[in-house]
């Protein structure tokens, strides 16, 4: 690997392979994704794989569903990524992965699950406001808890964050305010397709909602 340039939609890798220099646009976010892709590429090359075919496949790689998955590019040109991060460490990692790719503002939308570790809520709020430019606290899976109390726990560690309980409205707000050089992160639910509220599982897919809000 000669160089790596982060972009809003992935990263451009400059590679030296068998003495020749190649550039490939890897449509994945994060330095760790580049490292993983290059390890896999090395295995293919060691097995006698064709360089041109290998580079073509690298340029078409897709992330695991709900793991820094690019759901849409907004009308303003800002990409929106959906990730399963639902712990302080997970949220910190997702934001850190996106930060080098962000020329403008990094807008983070997230919440915390009900009937789970309450101590992580203010910590997640603190992580979000420390590492994002705009933070929107919303509902995740409140389960049997009062959603407003969960948000209050998060907000205790997130001074300056916006609070929008309805997750769809929170996503729409983020998309509406995203400018061309911004990146939006919708964290917490990833590939989940339901929202658990008072014992009921209501249909809710972050990726689909993002696309509907951006349409």
For each predicted feature, which ranges?
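ATP-dependent carboxylate-amine ligase
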Residues: 9, 19, 27-29, 38-215
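A short beta-loop-beta micro-motif enriched in histidine and acidic residues
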Residues: 32
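Short nucleic-acid-contacting surface segments enriched for D/E, G, S/T with interspersed K/R
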Residues: 35
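A short, compositionally biased
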Residues: 5-12
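A generic structural motif
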Residues: 14-18
